[in-house]
């Protein structure tokens, strides 16, 4: 799929578990803070509305926070729902591009997108070839693939 924006801003969603401390979270904030706002309409959405980097986002970047607190065992709760159900629970708008930032829960949510016009990207920081790790978040390896 070729993405062309012309006179229209390309709507991009970066979906990440949270903006707590960590290198990946900081890299995401730096990335979106340096994107061309004349070409991209950028939204950062978190599963959990926690983290020290929320206030570091530029004013041009829209932020959507998820649950107000992080709860232990959330991956087990998320396994009760299909990716499509999770996607509908979190993502309320249409986007041209959705970037699942970090492997795991955010990738599972974004994989539930059924809009064929949306380009899906998974920003990985590890390899998911390890079945034990993959099934920690996904129901099984088939769902992880």
Q: What are these regions, as identified by a protein language model?
A:
Residues 9-13:
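Extreme N-terminal starter segment of soluble prokaryotic enzymes
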Residues 50-51, 106-110:
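Short, well-ordered alpha-helical microsegments
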Residues 100-106, 124:
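Short His-centered aromatic/hydrophobic patch
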Residues 116-120:
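A short helix->loop->beta-strand "cap" motif at the edges of active sites that frequently abuts
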């Amino acid at each position: 799929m070729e993405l062309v924006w012309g006179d229209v801003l390309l709507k991009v969603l970066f979906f990440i578990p949270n903006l707590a401390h960590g290198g990946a979270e900081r890299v995401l904030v730096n990335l979106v803070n340096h994107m061309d706002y004349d070409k991209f309409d950028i939204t950062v959405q978190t599963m959990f509305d926690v983290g020290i980097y929320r206030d570091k986002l530029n004013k041009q970047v829209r932020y959507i926070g998820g649950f107000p607190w992080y709860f232990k065992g959330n991956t087990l709760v998320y396994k009760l729902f299909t990716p499509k159900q999770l996607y509908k629970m979190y993502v309320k708008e249409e986007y041209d591009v959705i970037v699942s930032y970090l492997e795991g829960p955010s990738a599972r949510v974004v994989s539930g997108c059924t809009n064929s016009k949306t380009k899906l990207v998974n920003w990985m920081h590890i390899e998911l070839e390890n079945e034990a790790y993959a099934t920690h978040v996904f129901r099984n390896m088939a769902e992880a693939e």
